[in-house]
Amino acid sequence: MAVHVVDHPLVRHKLGILREDGISTSRFRALAQEISRLLTYEATKDLATEAKTITGWAGEVEVEEIKGKKITVVPILRAGLGMMDGVLDMVPGARVSVVGFYRDEETLQPVEYYVKLASNIDERIALILDPMLATGGTLMATIDLLKKSGCTNIKGLFLVAAPEGIEKIVKAHPDVDIYTASIDEKLNDAGYILPGLGDAGDKIFGTK
């Protein structure tokens, strides 16, 4: 497993705007999608390609096309949907798998309430989408679910991540790569990332 911080001037600039208190819903959505495109660029660097000959304007030309495993994007409801369009802009042929969890108030553990996975999930590369990797509990449950379904090539894409969540995933799933725009300072007592983004779901959907 590797943790990849996508350290780029455009990413840092856009993330800085995302952190602003009072940012509009439309602006937050747009920036979340823009950063998601850049995360996808990094997360797909290792896709296999093969040569192909096509007819260009001046005759035949050899080009490359992506081959091998197909991709499924896996937004975690609901906030992960805010990253989905940006990722699909980069990999428009990807299938969409959706998972949803709620937290049990007694055990504080994630409980699955919705799952719809792409066909042939065992033959696909899964890109899990969630704006924030905080405690790692929901991500852990998502990875477990995908692996039980036969998926072995899994990556997670996050706008920001907390060290605590990263450590948890590294220990439990060393074969899963994490891509994030920032590793933030820590979690507060309520489990929010500091400095973080606040409630990304509310900011994406305009709710409170």
From Swiss-Prot:
The keyword GTP-binding applies. Its EC number is 2.4.2.9. It comes from the Bacteria. Pfam families: UPRTase (PF14681). This is Uracil phosphoribosyltransferase. Allosterically activated by GTP. GO terms for molecular function: GTP binding; magnesium ion binding; uracil phosphoribosyltransferase activity. Binds 1 Mg(2+) ion per subunit. The magnesium is bound as Mg-PRPP.
